[in-house]
Amino acid sequence: MTRIFVLLLASLLPAAAADTLDIYWIDVEGGAATLIVTPGGDTVLMDAGWPGFENRDANRIRHVLTQEVEKDKIDYFITSHFHRDHSGGLNQLAAIVEIDTFVDHGDSVEQDRPRGKALWNDYLEVAEGKRLTIEPGDALPLTGASLTFVAARSKGLSEPLGSGPRNPHCEGAQLKEEDMTENGKSVGFVVKMGEFEFLNLGDLTWSFEHELACPVNLIGEVDLYQTTHHGLLSSGAPQLVKAVRPTVAVMNNGPRKGGSPDVWKGLRQVDGFVDLWQGHRNVQATDAESVDRKMIANFGETEDCQGHWIAAKVSKDGRFTLVNSRNGFAKTYSSK
């Protein structure tokens, strides 16, 4: 059963509707910060990058929010999980951007570790009294698009989003040890507008991806996929990726984090897959192991990085255009 949360809004007048659903991958140097703006003007941010670095990540997020999409607050901040590269930058962001509601999978499971305890205390400092803890199957009350949670706290959907076909890629599929860290607790969701669907599973790890895919594909097919866990080999189970059949993927990797050539190789084996866009060129990868330069937002090491973003602009007819802010390169795709 889907629970849709109804929250009191500060204004009775809705924001002017836009024509597109916009998704921004804000570069936070191997962390995560994915901003979604619905046609009805709702703003949803999953993760806030790293702490420190003279407010680098918080400032990059605020720039995209206020200058690129011309919004002044975040309606829903989703913490995928409590690790420094995802929730570490939240307090710095909350000091400069208004956030209405903080969405999470529940209390951190790493509070017994000094760094995990510090992250958890930081989260409570800004989120206490504004938290919304979700379960798979829940949905946010957005205008012009839907957002349904498909994973949280090592649990997946109890019922498929679509018809739930048996997945032929499960036969002989590789299994990996169950991950008990915060990565395995990651919040994941599907955003849908018309025929278009976008999947983001945070840093969900292999064994829980397998549960979403086998024996039945609980998610269905999507058009756009944020590669799980920055393109690291601990995630991206082929039995899931081949089942959801993305046309396009975006990888939020850093120059030396994620961006595994084997993940890129695996995507090329997906039926109907067209392009991978990357936040960074993996400085350790060869040209043969990398995507077309036009689809990479940043090159070189972190110290000199300008923090270029990648965006997807989704039209109501199902077409979606990926844009690289570094060079202005854009390419349009069709939904299934």
Task: Spell out what each predicted region is.
Residues A33, A58-R62, S87-N91, K117-N121, ...:
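Extracytoplasmic/secreted envelope proteins and their assembly/folding machinery
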